[in-house]
Amino acid sequence: MSTVVETVTALAQPIVAQHQFELVDVEFVKEGKSWYLRLYIDKPGGINIEECALVSDEVSEKMDALDPDPIPQAYFLEVSSPGAERPLKKPADFEKAVGDYIHVSLYQKIGNSKVYEGTLLSLTADSLDLEVNLKGRIKTLTIPRDAVAQARLAIKF
């Protein structure tokens, strides 16, 4: 799967950049019996449906021209906004999220949990500081960057 994601990322990045959009993420997943190629794009102020359709048309045209086809099976191409809970993947994503409420999944437990939600206070090249509510007490938790399996913005209720 990663070769599909890498190929599509390399193909889509210049198309997205040409329109001054950001390619947030690319996924190639099977759900039920169907395969989905998903591109998440964004720009300051948010992306609209016409912009998603534009990128979808251009990426689809480029994908159809590739020989050999990197995706031999049938699939659905979806281009959309990353939404309110956008993933944090690149260092720049984390830098933009300082001060925001985020969800972090870890490879192994730190303390008593593999999942934390809290406000991202600061980050370094090696770690991030997260202000979390642990049983009614506000604590600052330092999480090594290499312990983070996934991170995304979160909505605080």
Swiss-Prot record:
<dbReference type="GO" id="GO:0000028">
    <property type="term" value="P:ribosomal small subunit assembly"/>
</dbReference>
<dbReference type="InterPro" id="IPR035956">
    <property type="entry name" value="RimP_N_sf"/>
</dbReference>
<dbReference type="Pfam" id="PF17384">
    <property type="entry name" value="DUF150_C"/>
</dbReference>
<comment type="function">
    <text>Required for maturation of 30S ribosomal subunits.</text>
</comment>
<keyword id="KW-0690">Ribosome biogenesis</keyword>
<dbReference type="InterPro" id="IPR036847">
    <property type="entry name" value="RimP_C_sf"/>
</dbReference>
<dbReference type="GO" id="GO:0006412">
    <property type="term" value="P:translation"/>
</dbReference>
<comment type="similarity">
    <text>Belongs to the RimP family.</text>
</comment>
<dbReference type="GO" id="GO:0005829">
    <property type="term" value="C:cytosol"/>
</dbReference>
<dbReference type="InterPro" id="IPR028998">
    <property type="entry name" value="RimP_C"/>
</dbReference>
<protein>
    <recommendedName>
        <fullName>Ribosome maturation factor RimP</fullName>
    </recommendedName>
</protein>
<keyword id="KW-0963">Cytoplasm</keyword>
<dbReference type="Pfam" id="PF02576">
    <property type="entry name" value="RimP_N"/>
</dbReference>
<dbReference type="InterPro" id="IPR028989">
    <property type="entry name" value="RimP_N"/>
</dbReference>
<dbReference type="InterPro" id="IPR003728">
    <property type="entry name" value="Ribosome_maturation_RimP"/>
</dbReference>
